[in-house]
Regions:
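Metal-dependent nucleotidyltransferase catalytic core
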Residues: 19-46, 54-67, 72-130
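Conserved nucleotidyltransferase catalytic core and NTase-mimicking acidic/glycine-rich helix/loop elements
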Residues: 168-318
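Short aromatic-enriched loop/helix-cap "lid" or pocket-rim segments at secondary-structure transitions
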Residues: 64-66, 141-143, 233
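Conserved NTP/Mg2+-binding pocket subregion across the NTase superfamily
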Residues: 12, 19-25, 94-202, 206-208, ...
Length: 318
């Protein structure tokens, strides 16, 4: 059968149907209490000295649903045997897909001696399991919301179960504010260049990966300053919508149309207008200097080419 003709929804359902637990078919996500017990039992079986849970599962402010990851850490005397032979992970259940970032050949290691197994199971459960050598346990001190699940030797005594302030949006310095604003306006000119050359992917890539991200950064600041910088909009700004009115949300998401040269150009113009407005608001509320002349110059440049329908003069095409 051609891969184009496969019904992947049915394939997934069939893969669920073959799972067995207590001789019964499993087609639902396992309960949180059951997962906690499983995490403890597997950890004890492999010799974990301490077991901790962090992330959104320990954050009382995080919305609760079955899609929340279980961010788990096993503190081990020696993690290498568990890295060399991952067969012990089978005890958690059938895995749909797995990643091991610290073993990646395309990205450099980032945990300095710890190792993670990122696992998405067939029933929908997601566990991000970090193996931390006992000698490196101090590195967990800044793990947001770390909550000991098993710690007979008080290895995780430094854990602060209620501390999620690590996630709070930080008040920017003058230098940081200036650099973020400059980056937005500077990269705007790359988008214009791509539009004039009819290089849609080039233009859209710069608009989304840089300009859009800088806009979200300043949207976060506007939210945070109203909350005395004691708030988080979540990873990848996933909670930002809850701080905006329906109108504001529609206006923001309308900027994500990069499907044509014209649409991408309109998104750039609207994005610039919104960024400029929010930057001025932040400048006033936080007492930060904003280079309005830089902003006006780039907006005028963008508007000039927009009014020419992103068409270069013939003499400039040579």
């Amino acid at each position: 059968m051609s891969w184009k003709k496969r019904n992947y929804a049915n394939i997934y359902k069939k893969s669920l149907a073959v799972q067995k637990r207590n001789e019964k078919e499993v087609e639902t996500v396992r309960e949180e209490a059951e997962l906690h017990q499983l995490i403890l039992s597997v950890g004890q079986r492999v010799g974990a000295r301490a077991i901790g849970l962090s992330g959104s599962r320990t954050d009382p402010q995080a919305p609760k649903d079955f899609l929340q990851d279980f961010d788990v850490v096993y503190v081990m005397d020696d993690i290498q045997p568990l890295v060399d032979d991952p067969s012990w992970l089978e005890a958690f259940g059938p895995i749909m897909i797995r990643q091991t970032p610290e073993a990646s050949t395309i990205y450099p290691p980032s945990l300095g001696g710890c190792f993670t197994y990122l696992m998405h199971f067939l029933d929908g459960v997601r566990i991000d399991l970090m193996l931390c050598p006992l000698a490196l346990v101090d590195r967990l001190a800044n793990e947001p919301g770390l909550q000991p699940l098993l710690d007979p030797d008080q290895i995780l005594s430094f854990a602060n179960q209620a501390n999620h302030s690590h996630y709070w949006i930080k008040r920017p310095t003058q230098a940081a504010f200036q650099e973020h604003c400059n980056e937005f306006w500077w990269v705007s000119t790359y988008v214009v260049k791509g539009l004039l050359r009819k290089q849609l992917i080039y233009a859209a890539d710069h608009l989304y990966t840089i300009c859009w991200q800088e806009l979200l950064w300043i949207e976060d600041l506007f939210v945070a300053q109203a909350q005395q910088f004691q708030v988080s909009t979540g990873k990848n700004h996933k909670y930002l919508q809850s701080f905006l009115t329906e109108k504001e949300w529609r206006e923001l998401t309308s900027l994500l149309d990069f499907s044509t040269i014209t649409a991408c150009g309109q998104s750039l113009l609207k994005m610039q207008k919104r960024f400029d407005k929010q930057a001025k608001n932040i400048s006033e509320k936080l007492g930060l200097a904003y280079d309005w002349q830089e902003a006006e110059n780039v907006q005028a440049y963008t508007k000039y080419w927009s009014e020419k329908n992103w068409q270069m003069e013939p003499e400039n095409q040579k």
